[in-house]
Amino acid sequence: MRILEVYIEHAALDLDRPFSYAYLGDKKVEKGYRVSVPFRNQILIGFVSSVIETPLTKEEYEEKTAYILKEVIDVIDEECLLNDMQWKLATFLSNYYFTPLIRVLQTMLPPSLKPKSSSLKAPKIAYETYVEIVSSNEEGLTDQQIEWLRRVAKEERILKKDFRSKSILEKLIALERVKLVKEEKRRLTIKSSPMETPKALTEDQQKAIQSFLTSSKETTLLEGVTGSGKTEVYLRLAEHYIQNGKSVLFLVPEISLTPMMIEYFSRRFIEKIAILHSELTPGQKYDEYRRIASGQAKIVIGARSAIFAPLKNLGLIILDEEHVETYKQENAPCYHALEVAKWRAKEEGARILLGSATPSLESRARALKGVYGYIQLANRIHQGALPETEIIDLLNPNSVDKDSVLFSLSLRKAMKEALDKKEQIVLLLNRRGYAPYVSCRKCGYVFKCPTCDIALSYHKEDQMLKCHHCDFVMQAPKVCPECGSTYLSKQGFGTERIEEEVTRLFPHAKTLRLDSDVSKVRQNVEKVLKKFQNQEADILIGTQMIAKGHDFQNVTLVGVVLADMGLTMPSFRSSERTFQLITQAVGRAGRGTKKGKAFIQTYMPTHYAVRLGAKQDYAHFFQIEMNSRRMQQYPPYTYLISLTLTCISEDKVHDIALEIKEMLEEENIEDLTILGPTVPYIKKQGNMFVEQLLLKYKEAKKIEIVLDKIRRKLALKSGYRLKIDRDPYDF
């Protein structure tokens, strides 16, 4: 008999230990196989963590141990899904992020390989059958047979489904002129791009590449101004590692950036690339994962979750736009791709390159301390100048355009001039929808999400009110539910309204919009960006998705419609985010041969994040913001952990939060500051009340032990959920 130790996924319970099952079958089963097992009154899928051979029968074992073993129902896999390195990584993440191991394993794997019941219905390997040439001898063939034989010979192979005559095919096979070859099908098609000769490097780029290759640092920060040629540095380094038998993992912070990077890399490495991100179909993810695991792919391009790609001989990990918060996952396990990259680099002997024009304060601080290597690209390629910038004070009556509530006189004039010159424009507003809330003019009622208790945003395109936090949707009402009034007012503005205003002011201009509403439909992002790249539209309107990474050669004007919107958010990172967004947006202008200009509209023109973002003066911003962080004891001067409790009862969630705080205080941990419990900005999640505690600390070891003990103790309680977020971006 074999006893299997199995980690089980359960929707309601945090099962953070293996369960023992008897396996009486004869199938091969090892660590890393999935099995179906009975658990309570359900049949669940789990991962085998160990196999114990025993000479005892099931009955003898139960009699000896006084423990009744349930039996494994079936072994699902024919091969191991997880290698030893992946198990070690999962164990590290489980401990580091205080998350059950099974949940980490779910995060690491594509849908069809997850330890979940739904994965059993997922697509498996797809195949295609080809007709290949065996002999070009035409002797004894009919005219039609010769025609098809020549076609196969010319193309070397054709798909069987394209061979229209079944009888001719069967005859050619019988005469040993052609043969059928069955091959695994790749469901993801990468559009072929003409192979290009690498661009000539600038002196700065040459020095950057040489500096990285000769550095002994495991992690290096590449800080380069917008348009300085960081992408070419990435490509050359990837080429170096590929030529030396290594593989490369290239991460982007948003899916919208993958088409552009795929195009860049496919011009150099077409047959070696695999793609991983959430917009792929389950079948495509499965195919790409298999190509990576088998060693066919040498380069993986993808978003955050691609960090788990099982590349062989990993040599280089690149995080482009490393400062972007989407590298951090919000749901458990709340991992940061950089932390996973560091673990993999250490275990697999790889190097890490972090690239950004506006690095996170934590990364730049480590670079200046010598913890990371530090490389700078201070100039744009071809010695191009940075865009001229003008800050527009929206409180100044002389700036106001009486014919437009959204655009100042200066920005509107500049837009007209750019359009007259057939130049392109980018307009940024980091808020989607038409209006952020709808209120009743008579009684003041504001339409709110029933589960989150925050204002619903109005989307004019589909006449809906939407919650941007939980995706609750309702038809836009015409009557106030409180007083019955029909006088409803749409307050504020989003990207939809910007698009409407542009169309009103410039009716002949062709506009495109790119935000998360547009990107929800697969392929929309690529279509919008390709159209704008091909100059099929004059103006691109969007959220932060359009602010970073894109290289539009004909864009000469950027307008940041409301630059200070993020400064009102309750976050210690609000100034940093605002600075980064302005800097990145301004950097989209003037990347070609024409000079660029940017207009930054704001109600806070003297704020240092706005002023220095307009100048792209990162060094000065870094000094000011680091002083602020030091005074308030926020990262990088301290570490953070947020504890988020949710419960159906408002009183109970507060009581448990106080209990946790008391347990932490009893440990008397040195240099630990406990803030809260407090009710966050979004005070409800899924109709459950929320409270938070924030921990500031400097020594990790003791806090890890205490939090793990608290987590396991509270796991015995029911009716609430606890999320532990290490190094949170927000709280």
Regions found by a protein language model. Give the residues of each.
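Short, intrinsically disordered low-complexity segments
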Residues: 43, 673-701
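Short beta-strand elements
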Residues: 512, 668-680, 720-727
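Conserved beta/loop motifs at nucleotide-recognition and modification sites
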Residues: 208, 427, 662-666, 670-672
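Basic, glycine-rich polyanion-binding accessory segments appended to enzymes
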Residues: 61-62, 657, 662, 671
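Beta-strand-connecting loop/turn residues
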Residues: 2, 42, 461-463, 687
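Accessory, non-ATPase domains that flank or precede helicase/AAA+ motor cores in DNA-metabolism machines
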Residues: 1-356, 368-384, 667, 694, ...
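Inter-lobe coupling/hinge segments of SF2-like helicase ATPases
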Residues: 196-202, 206, 218-654, 661, ...
